[in-house]
Amino acid sequence: MTFIRNLPGPLLIFLGALSLSFGGLIVKSFEGATLWQILFWRSLFFSLTVLAFLILSYRGKTIESFYKSGLPGFVGGIILSFGFCGYVFAMYNTTVANTNFIISLQILFLAIFGYFFLKEKINLITLFSICLAMTGVLLMVGNSLSPGELSGNLAAFTMPITFAVLIMIVRKFPSVDMVPAQFVAGVSSCLIGFLLSTKIMISPHDIFLGFLAGFFQVGFGFIFITIGARTTPSAMVGIIMLSESVLGPIWAFLFVSERPSVFGLIGGAIILS
């Protein structure tokens, strides 16, 4: 897995955002699984994916990698697990548009946290890019926002906040491999899903969707982002991550014929520019 770690940071961030952009489509495609069942299976396959990546990367030193990640890795994993729970809860209880819009606010949290905690200056070009990108997001999803469920909207805020905190930890300790933190997050959220589910077994169709979500969507997504963030400024991470909000509606259009509005197309073009 050395070739992945040698890829440019911004490219890895984009690949991670690309993977994560399928989240809404996958969660909305479950047929009979409950919120907590989705969380359990998604987190289970995610944990296995991260563990497999660590074994392939470290081989006989896999356990040592957890030890070396230390307290930053453990704390980062626990914090991120709340984001995982909030993401599934939001997608289950409110619209994909609402959730994507709220998640896109991570760009603000990243820039602000980076400024205060890492002393990363926000230059005029970056500030302009943030404003331009946020304008694109507002145009893209603002026209289709619905009131939604208050609980789902509030839960969605846990994702950009916990993601920003994780990136701060990654940037603060660039020499520490934070991929083990992803395993901690997966196991923690899997345990939460298990404890809150009345039963674990779901249909084969939904188990397959859980596999897609855990392996492809969040598995590759957060592995790429965690590695890429080590060499990418926090504000730049936020700007690139906005592509998740652009691509999500595109997948909905391609696979479930959900047509984006004219404002959505214009907003997406602004962000990609």
Q: Which functions belong to the PLM regions below?
A:
Residues 1-18, 46-75, 88, 121-127, ...:
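Membrane-interface interhelical linkers
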Residues 1-39, 78, 86, 145-172:
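Glycine-/small-residue-enriched transmembrane alpha-helix faces in small-molecule transporters
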Residues 67, 100-103, 119-139, 146-155, ...:
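Loop-to-transmembrane alpha-helix entry segments
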